[in-house]
Amino acid sequence: MSALAFRERPPAAEPRGLLILHHGRGTDERDLLPLADVHDPQRELQVVSPRGPLQRPGWPGYHWYAVPRVGYPDPETFAATYSALSEFHDELWERTRLGPEQTVLGGFSMGTVMSYALGLGRDRPAPAGILAFSGFVPTVDDWVPELQSRTATHVFIAHGRNDPIIGVEFGRRARALLEGELDVEYHETDAAHYVDPAYLPAALHWLERAAPDPSGGDG
């Protein structure tokens, strides 16, 4: 059984898919759950938000890995969290009977990094979508993105041009890396390091398209 704590927002009826939200640095599993009702107002998705496994000296909340340099996670803590999240996702798919092809991995900041890592890792199954707010595709030892087998994966990237924490160039690099192989939708606003409400209507529309419809439609 995975050791990661989590919170869950159940669907109103039989879910059409699964949305896993990974919080940012220094918060916890409660932080992104309010986005569930924004992105899925009809409560058609099972929504789960795990808690990062690390606490860092001098920081509040929880973290996914140590940060020696933006863009380059600490290899040791990254690898441990990658393994823990892999186990968490696998157990969640077994419990909910919703597979990776019905799953959107989402996150903010450090949580986006882990969504990219688990969604693009060569030893992990391809998800239906990746919802990426203000993050980056990591550069880290022993991890490389595998793109050619993920051409059906939808990616939504949103990044603020005035982000002082993770500069907008990281969002642009992710777009450049992914758009040749995956279905990428990209947005920028003048926001700093937060989820700009201006992104949300487009994200809602994207999620309806990315999350599969059990009736056989496009979702």
Regions found by a protein language model. Give the residues of each.
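Short beta-strand immediately N-terminal to the catalytic nucleophile in serine-hydrolase-like folds
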Residues: L105-G107, F133
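Serine-hydrolase catalytic machinery in alpha/beta-hydrolase-like enzymes
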Residues: M1-Q102
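C-terminal catalytic histidine-bearing segment of alpha/beta-hydrolase fold enzymes
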Residues: V168-G219
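Short beta-strand/loop motif that positions the catalytic acidic residue
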Residues: I157-H159, D163
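Gly/Ala-rich beta-loop-alpha elbow adjacent to hydrolase catalytic centers
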Residues: G107-G111, S115
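Short alpha-helix in the alpha/beta-hydrolase fold that links the catalytic acid
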Residues: L32-L35, W143-V144, G167-L177
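Active-site signature of alpha/beta-hydrolase-fold catalytic machinery across serine-
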Residues: P34, A117-G121
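A conserved short beta-strand
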Residues: P125-V137
